[in-house]
């Protein structure tokens, strides 16, 4: 009997202030390494990674974008082909948290379907540098921001210490796939009264990427809280 494995292609976009660690997060996920050397991203670039989980092969494009407004050049057409957005801030830098409102408005204004309706992208919020001795943002403020902006996925991560990097991305991929299934079921049943299930994420875990049960392959370079 032939085992048919499903294949998914996903495009994820990282946005946030300069120097919050977007590039470091990608390098930790893709190459399992961290460097102290800082180089600002200009425009946008991407890295690719393939994961296998739950009998699904998922090819992911992770887009690293500039954290400076003058380099913000992502068009509506770019966002139409996106499957999710990853908002990143530095938990030791309060201004990077305050500026989440700017980045949220930016991608919301660009995420427009061809028919003019707003594209409802899943959002993952990452508080990077969770291993920092200085915490500048109170947890209650983060929870309130998540509630105000209807963000259900939030992780505290560290690219330097490899905390929750892989776990957070895999959870986002899981949510995207589940939403796709729900959408397909709604279209198949064609029932306006059908109830859709909500996903509740609870708990914090600080596992390191070296515990790798899925053995994901790299293709080409180019503390979860329930926010209610």
Swiss-Prot record:
GO biological process, one term: vesicle-mediated transport
InterPro entries cross-referenced by the UniProt entry: P-loop_NTPase, Small_GTP-bd, Small_GTPase
UniProt KW keywords: GTP-binding, Lipoprotein, Nucleotide-binding, Prenylation
Top-level taxon in the UniProt lineage: Eukaryota
Motif (Effector region): 38-46
Keyword Cytoplasm listed: no
Region (Disordered): 183-228
Skewed-composition ranges (Low complexity): 211-228
Pfam families membership: Ras
Residues holding GTP: 16-23, 64-68, 128-131
Residue numbers with lipid attached (S-geranylgeranyl cysteine): 224
MF annotations from Gene Ontology: GTP binding; GTPase activity
Composition skew (Acidic residues), residue ranges: 185-196
Family: Belongs to the small GTPase superfamily. Rab family.
NCBIfam families for this protein: small_GTP
Name of the featured protein: Ras-related protein Rab-32D
Species this protein is from: Dictyostelium discoideum
């Amino acid at each position: 009997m032939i085992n048919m494995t499903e294949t998914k292609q996903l495009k994820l976009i990282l946005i946030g202030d300069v120097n919050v660690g977007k590039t470091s997060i990608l390098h930790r996920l893709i190459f399992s390494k961290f460097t102290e050397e800082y180089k600002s991203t200009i425009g946008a670039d991407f890295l690719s990674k393939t994961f296998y989980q739950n009998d699904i092969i998922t090819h992911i494009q992770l887009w690293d974008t500039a954290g400076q407004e003058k380099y913000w050049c992502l068009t509506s057409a770019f966002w139409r082909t996106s499957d999710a957005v990853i908002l990143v801030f530095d938990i030791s830098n309060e201004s990077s948290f305050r500026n989440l409102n700017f980045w949220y408005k930016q991608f919301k204004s660009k995420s427009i379907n061809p028919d003019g309706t707003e594209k409802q992208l899943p959002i993952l919020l990452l508080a990077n540098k969770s291993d920092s001795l200085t915490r500048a943002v109170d947890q209650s403020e983060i929870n309130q921001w998540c509630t105000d902006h209807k963000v259900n996925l939030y992780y505290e991560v560290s690219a330097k210490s490899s905390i929750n990097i892989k776990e957070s991305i895999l959870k986002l991929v899981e949510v995207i796939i589940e939403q796709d299934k729900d959408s397909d079921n709604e279209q198949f049943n064609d029932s306006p009264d059908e109830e859709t299930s909500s996903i509740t994420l609870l708990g914090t875990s600080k596992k390191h990427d070296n515990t790798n049960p899925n053995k994901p392959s790299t293709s080409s370079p180019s503390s979860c809280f329930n926010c209610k």
